[in-house]
């Protein structure tokens, strides 16, 4: 794996000169191998190591290189044709392979090659971009977008129209992460490498980026870029110091543990916020 990483990093340093015509076989083979490993879930752009999320920047480099070294090509769909550098993930799947990998794909859901979909997932008409990792038992509901390299945990529900931000450039940026057992309400947007920690519930229409204030009403603490585990979050506003205006924020209205979440439905958690 170290050799593969070295090839990718060296090629990325010289990416300005790379084209489909000039790329050498070693680089092309390395990029193809990485995309296939991402596609199968054997590699992932980010993973939790000793309780901390670690981003493997060289894998993002490989994804970016794939755009430089591949020509656009015709992609056949059920109702149209497409023209792009990245093949669709399911273009060569047959019934046997779908049954073996154990997830459902409802038309016209789309996933690009290099995205991993684990067992018992359901893709309603949605979009999963290259480098994304969707773990077991997750529902990706209608019109949801899972951005490039985003990391979605086990037993997550991404409700209708949710946007999970992608990140390929700038290279140093970290992917957006939704940890296990989270619920993201309809039309919410989680972007810019924000981490939603395990067991959190995000209400409908909540927008969180790196600059969004995440206000804990119980403690008065303000978080940035991270929703603590077990938080129930709704949209809100915080007043300016002089009281002349207010600005949007996300409000942590309560904390719940796994036991409570198991006994109480999501709707109940969101309704009883007073």
UniProtKB/Swiss-Prot annotation:
Protein name (Swiss-Prot/TrEMBL): 2,3,4,5-tetrahydropyridine-2,6-dicarboxylate N-succinyltransferase
Subunit comment: Homotrimer.
Biological or metabolic pathway of the protein: Amino-acid biosynthesis; L-lysine biosynthesis via DAP pathway; LL-2,6-diaminopimelate from (S)-tetrahydrodipicolinate (succinylase route): step 1/3
Keywords associated with the record: Acyltransferase, Amino-acid biosynthesis, Cytoplasm, Diaminopimelate biosynthesis, Lysine biosynthesis, Repeat, Transferase
Annotated residues for binding of substrate: 104, 141
Family annotation (HAMAP family): DapD (MF_00811)
EC number(s) reported in the record: 2.3.1.117
One Pfam family hit: Hexapep_2
Subcellular location: Cytoplasm
Reaction equations catalysed: (S)-2,3,4,5-tetrahydrodipicolinate + succinyl-CoA + H2O = (S)-2-succinylamino-6-oxoheptanedioate + CoA
Organism listed in the record: Photorhabdus laumondii subsp. laumondii (strain DSM 15139 / CIP 105565 / TT01)
Alphabetized InterPro entries for the sequence: DapD_Trfase_Hexpep_rpt_fam, Hexapep, THP_succinylTrfase_dom1, THP_succinylTrfase_N_sf, Trimer_LpxA-like_sf
Family, as annotated: Belongs to the transferase hexapeptide repeat family.
Entry GO MF terms: 2,3,4,5-tetrahydropyridine-2,6-dicarboxylate N-succinyltransferase activity; nucleotidyltransferase activity
NCBIfam families the UniProt entry points to: dapD, PRK11830.1
GO CC entries: cytoplasm
Source superkingdom: Bacteria
PANTHER family: 2,3,4,5-TETRAHYDROPYRIDINE-2,6-DICARBOXYLATE N-SUCCINYLTRANSFERASE, MOLYBDENUM COFACTOR GUANYLYLTRANSFERASE
Top-level enzyme category: transferase
Principal location class: cytoplasm
GO terms of biological process kind: diaminopimelate biosynthetic process; lysine biosynthetic process via diaminopimelate
